[in-house]
Amino acid sequence: MAEHNLIRQELNKLKQMPPWGRQQGDRWDKLSNFIYHTQTLADLWARIVEVAWREKLEPREFGAYAVRRWYNHHTHDQILRLFYAHPTVEPESDAKHRTVDFYLRGLPFDLKISRFPAAYPQSLKYGWQHRHHLAHWLYVHQSQQGRFHTGNRLFIILHNRLAPVLAWQLRRDFEALAQQVGHFLEAPTLLGLTLSQAGQTHRPWAGVIFYVKS
């Protein structure tokens, strides 16, 4: 518990989210894999400077990359724990499984957390009311980013009405997220999708949870 409290305190210390600055790639992912075992921002920046100096990288650019990965990983991990706390959810035993985070009523799911996509062709209200359409769009859109798989997914969509660019801060609002996750898990609405890829038809299940801050 103390460890979880520490990482949450450190996540709250981040005042600004730096831009990626470059497309995510295998080399910089490998060089920044220390983010998985680094809890404090002070230790994070110490490792960033160390690796940047050793690999002759620009510290600010590499730092932005590593900070984003650190924040996204640890907020994802903490949000997963909100699911694990519910009696209908069973964690995947292999923490490195690429497409399954947990089982909901026996069905495997991959958790995806993102801001409401600016490229979505409809409004937030439309996506809220037509979650099947939004979920289908997210699958297709993510296929264009090289992250496509046809397994079941549970999407958490974040949106700050007053400042959409600050949606990243909602990833660490664990109290509000716990309420949204708990509400969904009490009576899960699962959407049956039909997807086509390389001449094959896939029918995954999807769920969509919104956290919208006014």
Labelled PLM ranges:
Residues 102, 107-115:
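Conserved catalytic cores of phosphodiester-cleaving nucleases, focusing on short active-site segments
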Residues 1-98, 113-214:
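Nucleic-acid endonuclease domains
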